[in-house]
């Protein structure tokens, strides 16, 4: 198969050093003035470059390309001016919307938005954003911190007060109830001291000395009560106050069914009758004395009788205890005293 269109090429010469020199190479490429590339005697590429007869023509075309429409230039300048104005902080100090203080400063743009400048008030220590809602939270959340501190202080103060109250209660209350001792006195609180009873003779009472058995253990014998004339009859020799239930005060009261001022058989006799009564002894000698009581017929039922042992025989004979239990001198017109 033969291709007639394929051109045959001659092999390059064997002399390589000579072929390296373009001057010696018969097929070297040359660039002519008209812009055509020739190789040896054969023209390989023919291209005619445009010639520039006017050298100022290139500068005119560059100036025309850089020329901008005045309308578009004005729009871009306005946009750049607006952005520059928004990016700059507001001039002057703005008044705080809360306290109207001028001691404010510009901080930054909220969320990097140029339309939301954020300011800080040094007076009330709060931020505010132009166009945003006002927040009452100060810098660092001071309100919340103060609330926690106050609640903690109140709790600690209440706990300390509770501890102090409990300590005071423990200090005042006795540790053991067995250590509490009742301070008992041998004499009753409603009775005067018995040592000065003999000195009452100057006012007309003429009370004899009473030899009471005052024990140091807080027990009072029944003779002490008999000496005072409170009880008549019955065996009350046991202690009045003590741990023995059989000899306590209630037992002594039960055994003594009546007082010395009233007779046991008082309601069994008529008023004109005379009753001989045996009175209890007084003191250590236990001297028994009998007194005859004359009971007169009286509508009021007044009873006059001497108190045995409390009136000396040598003193006035008209002293007695009235029915009301009050000492006084009798009137000779109404009552008479007879001593056996």
From Swiss-Prot:
PROSITE patterns: ZF_DOF_1, ZF_DOF_2. The keyword Transcription applies. InterPro entries: Dof (IPR045174), Znf_Dof (IPR003851). It comes from the Eukaryota. It is found in: Nucleus. Residues 12-33, 138-180, 301-340 are annotated as: Disordered. A zinc finger (Dof-type) spans 94-148. GO terms for cellular component: nucleus. Keywords: DNA-binding, Metal-binding, Nucleus, Transcription, Transcription regulation, Zinc, Zinc-finger. GO terms for biological process: regulation of DNA-templated transcription. GO terms for molecular function: DNA-binding transcription factor activity; transcription cis-regulatory region binding; zinc ion binding. Pfam families: Zn_ribbon_Dof. Its main location: nucleus. Zn(2+) binds at residues 96, 99, 121, 124. Residues 151-165 have a biased composition (Low complexity). Residues 166-180, 309-331 have a biased composition (Polar residues). The keyword Transcription regulation applies. PANTHER family: DOF ZINC FINGER PROTEIN DOF1.4-RELATED (PTHR31992), DOF ZINC FINGER PROTEIN DOF2.2 (PTHR31992:SF107). Transcription factor that binds specifically to a 5'-AA[AG]G-3' consensus core sequence. This is Dof zinc finger protein DOF2.2. It comes from Arabidopsis thaliana. The lineage of its organism: Eukaryota, Viridiplantae, Streptophyta, Embryophyta, Tracheophyta.
């Amino acid at each position: 198969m033969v291709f007639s269109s394929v051109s045959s090429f001659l092999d390059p010469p064997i002399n390589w050093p000579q072929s390296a020199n373009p001057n010696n190479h018969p097929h070297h490429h040359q660039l002519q003035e008209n812009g055509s590339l020739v190789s040896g005697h054969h023209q390989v590429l023919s291209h005619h470059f445009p010639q520039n007869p006017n050298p100022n023509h290139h500068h005119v075309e560059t100036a025309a390309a850089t020329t901008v429409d005045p309308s578009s230039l004005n729009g871009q300048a306005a946009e750049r001016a607006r952005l520059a104005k928004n990016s700059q902080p507001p001039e002057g100090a703005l008044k705080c919307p809360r306290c109207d203080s001028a001691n404010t400063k510009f901080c930054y743009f909220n969320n990097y938005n140029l339309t939301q400048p954020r300011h800080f008030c040094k007076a009330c220590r709060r931020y505010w954003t132009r166009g945003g809602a006002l927040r009452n939270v100060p810098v660092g959340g001071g309100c919340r911190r103060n609330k926690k501190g106050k609640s903690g202080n109140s709790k600690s103060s209440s706990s300390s007060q509770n501890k102090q109250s409990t300590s005071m209660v423990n200090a005042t209350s006795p540790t053991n109830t067995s250590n509490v001792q009742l301070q008992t006195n041998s004499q009753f609180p409603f009775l005067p001291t018995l040592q000065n009873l003999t000195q009452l003779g100057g006012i007309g009472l003429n009370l004899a000395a009473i030899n009471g058995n005052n024990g140091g253990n807080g027990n009072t014998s029944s003779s002490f009560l008999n000496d005072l004339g409170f009880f008549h009859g019955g065996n009350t020799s046991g202690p009045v106050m003590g741990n023995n239930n059989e000899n306590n005060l209630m037992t002594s009261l039960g055994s003594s069914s009546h007082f010395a001022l009233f007779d046991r058989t008082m309601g069994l006799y008529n008023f004109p009758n005379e009753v001989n009564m045996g009175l209890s002894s007084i003191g250590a000698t236990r001297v028994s004395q009998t007194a005859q009581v004359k009971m007169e017929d009286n509508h009021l039922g007044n009873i006059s009788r001497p108190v045995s042992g409390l009136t000396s025989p040598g003193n006035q004979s008209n002293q007695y205890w009235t029915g009301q239990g009050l000492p006084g001198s009798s009137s000779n017109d109404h009552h008479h005293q007879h001593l056996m």
